[in-house]
Regions:
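DEDD superfamily 3′-5′ metal-dependent exonuclease/proofreading module
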Residues: 1-165
C-alpha cells in the first residue's frame, strides 16, 4: 500500500497521463481503491490507436508496428504478469519480481513509442511537424528469468488468480 500511495503522490505533479486502456481499467481502479480522483488529462492510446486503424491489445499493436520485446519476453502478457506476482508473493523469488518489473518497464517504454507514432500519423494528416522517435533504451537492470516464465506458462495453475466466491 505504501508504494501505491507514493505513485499517487508522484503522478499528481503531472498534467497528462498516457495509458493503454487506462481510462477503462487503471484509473478507475486506482480511484476506487484509494477513494480519490485523479484530476489530470489522460491520453488513452487504446482508443487513439484504434482511430488510426490499430486494434487489439498492447502486445498485438506493438507487434503490428514492429516493436519487439526480445526473446526473453516472448509470449509474456498481462496474465503472465499476474502469475509472476503470485509466484513472487508465494516464494519471494527476486527473479520473479525482476521479470515483472522488466515487463512493466517495456510497457512504459513502448507506450512512449506508440504515442509518438500516433502523434506523427495525425501530424501527417494535418501537414504539421512530426516528432523524432527516440532510440528505445536497453534495460540493463531487472533481467527477466526466461526459465521461470516458461515454467509459469507451462504450469500456471498454482499461481493463477483465485476466483472470488
Amino acid at each position: 500500500m505504501e508504494y501505491e500511495k507514493e505513485f499517487l503522490d508522484y503522478i499528481k505533479d503531472y498534467s497528462i497521463i498516457v495509458t493503454f486502456n487506462g481510462s477503462c481499467f487503471d484509473i478507475p481502479f486506482l480511484e476506487r481503491y484509494f477513494e480519490t480522483n485523479i484530476n489530470c488529462a489522460q491520453i488513452d492510446l487504446r482508443f487513439l490507436l484504434k482511430e488510426l486503424g490499430y486494434s487489439g491489445g498492447l502486445k498485438k499493436i506493438e507487434h503490428d508496428v514492429g516493436l519487439s520485446r526480445g526473446d526473453d519476453m516472448e509470449g509474456v502478457n498481462g496474465y503472465t504478469a499476474v502469475l509472476l506476482w503470485n509466484y513472487y508473493k508465494d516464494t519471494k523469488d527476486k527473479t520473479a519480481i525482476d521479470s515483472l518489473i522488466h515487463y512493466n518497464l517495456l510497457d512504459t517504454i513502448n507506450l512512449e513509442h506508440l504515442l509518438c507514432l500516433a502523434y506523427n500519423k495525425y501530424a501527417d494528416m494535418y501537414k504539421t511537424k512530426t516528432l523524432e522517435y527516440r532510440t528505445l533504451p536497453i534495460i540493463e537492470s531487472y533481467k527477466p528469468n526466461k526459465k521461470l516464465i516458461d515454467y509459469l506458462h507451462k504450469n500456471p495453475y498454482k499461481y493463477a488468480p483465485k476466483s472470488e466466491s
